[in-house]
Amino acid sequence: TSYGNGVHCNKSKCWIDVSELETYKAGTVSNPKDILW
């Protein structure tokens, strides 16, 4: 499920798809991998 701003949730896990973040698109995020929490 996508909540916008790159945030997705699947069951109890949420993550940020950094490819969807404006900061990533602007080249200010160096790590292309998802940020999990």
From Swiss-Prot:
Taxonomy, superkingdom: Bacteria
Gene Ontology annotations for the cellular component aspect, listed alphabetically: extracellular region
Keywords: Antibiotic, Antimicrobial, Bacteriocin, Disulfide bond, Secreted
Major place of residence: secreted
UniProt keyword tRNA processing present: no
Subcellular location: Secreted
A Pfam entry, by short name: Bacteriocin_II
GO biological process: defense response to bacterium; killing of cells of another organism
Disulfide bonds: C9-C14
Database matches in InterPro entries: Bacteriocin_IIa, Bacteriocin_IIa_CS, Bacteriocin_IIa_dom_sf
Function: Bacteriocin active against Listeria monocytogenes and Lactococcus cremoris.
Family per record: Belongs to the bacteriocin class IIA/YGNGV family.
The protein's name: Bacteriocin lactococcin MMFII
Species of provenance: Lactococcus lactis subsp. lactis
